[in-house]
């Protein structure tokens, strides 16, 4: 009997020793960096709780429209961003590479193209070409015949790793982000866990067909938006809960500064709307465990070794803020319901609606602007 008990305890010991060795010593390839976030702002005052985004309806399908109803897999999944043309037609890119066009009533018109990658940020240029930040294939342009033209796949000799979002200036220059030159789209979680400054803000000049790096050492460079006067460009740094401003005109040209920081969530895409409002999509609210582990790279490496299903993720929570050109919060839009349309990855404003992208839904979201609070 004693011999049997000994064998059992020895087997348990070996199992635990193996598990501990795996969690602490197994190489991950990550080099997590310690960082020190500010205390997360409370959801009160300018970020007070509300359910305004409960007014979102699923859009971009001929069937199943309605609050939070996940649509049958017909057009694809994951419309991360939405572009809206002057006629109210909408364009969105999906997992698998398809880009689809819908009319203003949400009726499917046609497939624009298939990039064969992962189209993320979208914008229409001044002659109607659709410019696409494709995470896998770089910066692309799609003409009215559906022809795909690769604009750039590198900047100053360094290949694009994760092309994310873009905005187009009136002179045709395209400002765009490379979220991480080190970690690609399928491995974005690694960039979050590592918290290394692998992101870049870039500009492509169609006249010279050259790409220039404007800012580097960004912490997951995500959404990009030009100011209405085109004197500066904003880029979201998801992993730092902040938005950075880069001046492209004036006496500060070529310099950067923090536009707004210590946000209550993870900033994803950003766009400029009417009345000079910058709409910032927050992928989800801040997580206590993420901030707790910020200065503990050893523990983050252990967490990374755990099964993917055990990794902490933001809860289902719709969150969007609108700020003015000084970074002051003007709109605070939320829906904390577990059934909310979330995570929201982008916001685009038209005359009558706000449109919302998401990585998980089969359609994108839409809400009447009449539902916005009066400020």
Specify the residue positions occupied by each region the protein language model found:
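Sequence-structural signature of mature extracellular/luminal beta-sheet repeat domains
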Residues: 2-375
